[in-house]
Amino acid sequence: MGTRIDIIGWGGDGMSIVNAVVGVVARHEDMWSVFRPSSEVSRLNSVVASAGGGGGASCCGADSAVAGPGLVVSVETDRLLRDALALAEATGGAFNPLIGPLVAAWDVKAMRAAYVAGVPLPPAPSERVVEAALRVSAWGLLSRVGERRWAMGTPVESVGGADAPSPRLDLGGIAKGHTADACRDLAVAMGARGVLVSVGTSSVSVFGTRADGSPWRAGLRDPHGGPTSVAGVVELPAGDMASLSTSGDNLGPLGGVRVVCAGSAVGPLAGSVAGSVEDRRARETLRETSAGGGRIFDHHIIDPRTGYPAHAGVRQVSVVASSGVLAEALSTALLVDPSIDVPDVVAHWARETSAPASAKVVGLVRAES
């Protein structure tokens, strides 16, 4: 998944649990990575078919190869895709699994690199480019057209051409949370009496307590401070399962959370350049850079509803929820729209999954004026 994964726990055979967890991570990478052409997500992106036509294909072997449009996916991918659509609807599109064309239009990777280096940001895309990407980023283009069969349509008003963008699925916004939960659940099934799994340090799943009976605790980094600055510490529910997700505008390759465990940490905090000379230069560059008719934007987080960088004045959001998928979607959505009604999203999620659900915002850091 292009990031670090840490596991801390007690009970059961530690080495066997770690080896099994590695297998889960590898399997999820094989299914959902947009960088692997053979993954189910990549294959779905490559299928040019809508619910009304096109050829069928299967990810799951001959037993599931039925004629029809789109792509037949595994049971686990089917569940994650259904979750993605449910959360896109519940958040009014603030979370969007089809944001890929907009990310490409804004060249977010280059934007992040420029931010870290403290150099001028790459040129903003034209209004026409943004509008074209926005049309094919509508989450409603993704649909379940049969048993485990999924297709992506093309908007009627979409402009053709060799360089015209096409819908692009990316489950990265919730896959880490799902993987953290799956690894935790497997560890518990294998005898762990207390376990913490951290995927990228921005997605954390826990069960039980630490070996001394105290609750698991996670430190939330301070996006306005240095690389080891902590804005607060969250105690995760003792004796139960819980998931924590942090989304922010400057999360580095190591994520945004660290585990506070008797003075030690699972990995360094995010934003290794925060507070440095390079970071100050980058902040000045961001303040001086305008886009979209003179609009000043604060970071590289794209609002999938408008097609432009979010300007809600929020730097970082942390959510604790009963599900890693729910926590990730909420932290992402609240970053672009802090007015989202969390109880409504949770209620919608509970109806869709037919399971009790809960979520709570445990940290929200606003941008400095």
Predicted features, each with a name:
Residues 1-369:
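Mature catalytic core of soluble alpha/beta enzymes
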